[in-house]
């Protein structure tokens, strides 16, 4: 009886995962659009606005990391399995963490030139890769639910 309940709970969690993954697709697109505008805002002297937006984007990407971990566990995806080109869940999470630290350090040191470069080259790249990895996870979800 207990095993049956656990299976039902797990199946329910998997079913609820789909809408969350689709919502995250939209959020990642929104993050990408916002990141593309940040360097221009920096150059226009709107540092406070950029830093505020960057905090919101980082919080959203932190939520993405949590969702990705949960989805991988629920869908039995090995964290070391390559889901997009040579990117696995584990590698993407490490890359995001490393780039978050670089962005935080640049912001703390008020190195806005470096911060702009990190946004343009690293963060935008991370978001694009995150979108592709999420697409792979969503396909796995759809295969499992069907």
Where are the model-predicted features located?
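C-terminal-biased regions
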Residues: 1-146
């Amino acid at each position: 009886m207990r095993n049956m309940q656990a299976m039902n709970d797990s199946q329910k969690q998997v079913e609820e995962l789909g809408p969350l993954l689709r919502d995250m697709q939209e959020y990642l697109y929104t993050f990408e659009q916002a990141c593309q505008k940040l360097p221009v805002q920096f150059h226009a002297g709107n540092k406070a606005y950029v830093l505020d937006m960057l905090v919101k984007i980082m919080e959203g990407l932190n939520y993405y990391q949590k969702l990705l971990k949960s989805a991988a566990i629920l869908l039995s995806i090995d964290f070391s399995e390559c889901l997009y080109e040579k990117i696995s869940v584990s590698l993407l999470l490490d890359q995001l963490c490393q780039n978050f630290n670089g962005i935080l350090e640049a912001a703390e040191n008020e190195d806005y030139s470096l911060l702009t470069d990190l946004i343009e080259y690293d963060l935008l790249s991370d978001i694009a890769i995150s979108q592709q990895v999420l697409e792979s996870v969503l396909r796995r979800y759809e295969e499992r639910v069907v």
